[in-house]
Amino acid sequence: MRILMLAPEPFFEPRGTPFSEYHRLKALSELGHHVDLVTYPIGRDVAIPNLRIFRAWRPPLVSKVRIGPSFTKLVLDTLMLLTIARRVSRERYDAIHSHEEMGLVGVWLSRWLGVPHLYDMHSSLPQQLSNFTYSRSGVLRRLFTWAEVQMVLGSQSVITICQELQDEVTRMGAGDRSLLIENVMGGEVDEAPSKPAADIRTAWGIPADAPVALYTGTFEAYQGVELLVDAAAILAESRPDARVLVVGGEPQQVDRARAVARERGAVDVMVFTGQQPAREIPSFVQASDVLVSPRIRGTNTPLKIYSYLRSGRPILATNLLTHTQVLTSDIAVLVPPEPHALAEALAALIDDPAARQALAARARAVADERYSREAYVRRTAQAYARLSAGASGQVPTPQTVTER
């Protein structure tokens, strides 16, 4: 197939949805499809066979896009429409594949061009409003809910990335055309690590024998970085030799987090690196003893969880749906999103190397059995088989549903 893919993100940047898009593109390439990707003017090009990247025009003074809804995204989405119009006027496509809010454009395009549409559902749009504390407006939430229903019910095929989203699509009445494909490749990219694990500790002033807990990811409120800081302050009292290594965050976010750590007595055990190249994240993982995911809100499974399962390191996470869709107490330590609980669990893991090793081994076994790359590619092929089958049928007109 020749596919027009619409990705309203800074592709490629080392963060959630762009990682997911990267691996989807890799799978489609391996399956023999040709993809024209229309995306934001921000991000770096990646070399994938059968992929061409077309970027929207960059407006003055726009150099980055924060995660979640924003006015900047609205401007860039509008500019993407011009690039999309040029593509469809010059090329003939067999299918439209859209991500996030571009699903609404994808549904309209598919009807106009008479080709099938696949919606890649990475999150719930209404839930984004609360996750990113963007707005509490009931009107805006109803608008996002309406848009999501149009995208799901107006598509011939839907991919969901976690069980909660799959259940939501089923409740909408589109379960028969949706397929759950977990982001099993996580935040991995096809680049060799540039530094040995030992060099990571040296570079960031961490003693070779210090126990290290690692957090990697963004600093958005729902990620629970402040919870981790509070837990680190408690850990510092009993294990001042330990280090909590935090990889990620914009410079201003890192400065604020470091100030909070200083205020709460955690600064001596915390190391903030800021954003690091995606190819170096495996080295940070291997330089650590425990991997922490302290999320406090949301239902989507973090992409990093899947690569953590294969890492050979134990996972400590909050016992919320965002994690428990994949993690169980047999393959991870799950605790309430509370500083003392997180600190106590971290101290217990630090003090018990045998428990760490056993947890990591069981996690790797589950990853090999349930979350293999082969299964990911196979299910992507199934989604496109459904897309082709759905193209011959009539997609029902979306109906109004009660707001969730």
Report the location of each language-model feature.
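A short, well-ordered alpha-helix in the C-terminal region of glycosyltransferases
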Residues: 202, 348, 355-370, 376-382
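Carbohydrate-associated surface elements
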Residues: 164, 184
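Conserved acidic donor-binding segment of nucleotide-sugar-dependent glycosyltransferases
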Residues: 329-340, 348-354
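A short helix/loop element that forms part of the nucleotide-sugar donor recognition site in Leloir-type
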Residues: 191-206
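Short hydrophobic beta-strand element within catalytic cores of glycosyltransferases
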Residues: 290, 307, 314-317
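Nucleotide-activated donor-binding/catalytic signature segment of Leloir-type glycosyltransferases, i.e.
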Residues: 255-279
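N-terminal subdomain of nucleotide-sugar transferases
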Residues: 1-45, 91, 157, 235, ...
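Membrane-proximal helix-turn-helix segments that form the acceptor-binding/catalytic region
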Residues: 23, 82-89, 104, 108-112, ...
